[in-house]
UniProtKB/Swiss-Prot annotation:
GO biological process: tRNA threonylcarbamoyladenosine modification
Annotated protein name in UniProt: tRNA N6-adenosine threonylcarbamoyltransferase
Residues the entry annotates as binding Fe cation: 120, 124, 309
UniProt family annotation: Belongs to the KAE1 / TsaD family.
Subcellular location: Cytoplasm
Matches recorded under InterPro entries: ATPase_NBD, Gcp-like_dom, KAE1/TsaD, Peptidase_M22_CS, TsaD
Function: Required for the formation of a threonylcarbamoyl group on adenosine at position 37 (t(6)A37) in tRNAs that read codons beginning with adenine. Is involved in the transfer of the threonylcarbamoyl moiety of threonylcarbamoyl-AMP (TC-AMP) to the N6 group of A37, together with TsaE and TsaB. TsaD likely plays a direct catalytic role in this reaction.
Gene behind the chain: tsaD
Length: 343
């Protein structure tokens, strides 16, 4: 591979297969989406109440070639037009990651293109750059099925995790509470919709932890909800599902928003970003907007299409690595437990 030519029009083909979405996108100059094709497997996993790794991998194998071709066609570009190929290298399900990584390596090798490995959470954060330019220092609240983190950034590619969950991630707690309420997988959207018609009458606990901590804990809340429902059932009492959803969500949002605002003030950030699958939650989006309405801090909330896993966000994050000439070799591998800091 010769020297990388920095064209005026930097086109990156990005691939995301870390969990149960097969996605490919073409991103121009790190900020413009030319295509973003996503094939979801939710229906295949719904009856199991969660993602089954073996099924996820099989779906990725079936879909990846078609999805990449569709993304290229929709963007109206050929492989010769590309500046690089990017792919999620972790964290995620190892089998699922390998499908995307091997597809990206094959394309990079066949067309002599630079290869860029991207951290999945960096992708979620950089989804916001597809809306507006990032302003540093900034704080990102990352909320998803597997992650709940507050990440401080002083510059591009510099990630400092200042708060994280000590047990369950937010999305995980949502799914478990939803299952107890008899709601289908994934539970987040169902609880969010139910909560609109309920009241915070049950006053579930808030885990604030130590006064100076930005960490989170949701296992106690999850247990409190399950115990409330179990005890009511034993007593033959009827608890309104809407009130359970509203009370659970009120507790989650209270802690997330309060800690985010406190961290934003303490770290004197210019921008706060919302990122991750749970960022699609209407209750959380509204609460953050209300909390930062009068603050001199720019709050950026991505559209729903960029909250859940997609390849456009991977392309946006990869653009920074492309400019820094941070490329991967053909030994790039899927890393299910990849750390974010100093990515």
């Amino acid at each position: 591979m010769g020297d990388v030519v920095m064209n005026e029009r930097e086109l990156i083909l990005a691939i995301e297969t870390s969990c149960d979405e097969t996605s490919a996108a073409v991103i121009e100059n790190g900020t413009t989406i030319l295509s973003n094709v996503v094939s979801s497997q939710i229906d295949s996993h719904k009856r199991f109440g969660g993602v089954v790794p073996e099924i996820a991998s099989r779906h990725h194998v079936e879909q990846i070639t078609v999805i990449v071709e569709e993304a290229m066609h929709e963007a109206g570009v050929d492989f010769a037009d590309l500046a690089a190929v990017a792919v999620t290298e972790g964290p995620g399900l190892v089998g699922a990651l390998l499908i995307g990584v091997n597809a990206a390596k094959a394309i990079a090798f066949a067309h002599q293109l630079p290869l860029i490995g991207v951290h999945h959470i960096a992708g979620h954060i950089y989804a916001n750059r597809l809306l507006k330019e990032l302003e540093f220092p900034l704080l990102a609240l990352v909320v998803s099925g597997g992650h709940t983190e507050l990440i401080y950034m002083e510059n591009h590619g510099e990630f400092e995790v200042i708060g994280e969950t000590r047990d369950d991630a937010v999305g995980e707690a949502y799914d478990k509470v939803a299952r107890t309420l008899g709601l289908p997988y994934p539970g987040g959207p169902h609880i969010d919709r139910l909560a609109v018609n309920g009241e915070d009458t049950l006053q579930f606990p808030r885990a604030w932890l130590e006064p100076d901590s930005f960490d989170f804990s949701f296992s106690g809340l999850k247990s409190a909800v399950i115990n409330t429902l179990h005890n009511a059932k034993q007593r033959g009492e009827n608890v309104q599902a809407e009130d359970v959803a509203a009370s659970f969500q009120a507790s989650v949002i209270d802690v997330l928003v309060t800690k985010t605002k406190k961290a934003a003030e303490e770290y004197k950030v210019r921008q706060v970003l919302l990122a991750g699958g749970v960022a699609a939650n209407k209750g959380l989006r509204t609460a953050l907007e209300e909390a930062f309405f009068k603050e001199p801090i720019d709050l950026v909330i991505p559209p729903l299409s960029l909250c859940t896993d997609n390849a456009a966000m991977i392309g946006a994050a990869a653009s920074i690595k492309f400019k820094q000439q941070t490329f991967a070799g053909m030994d790039l591998n899927g890393q299910p437990s990849l750390e974010l800091e100093n990515d």
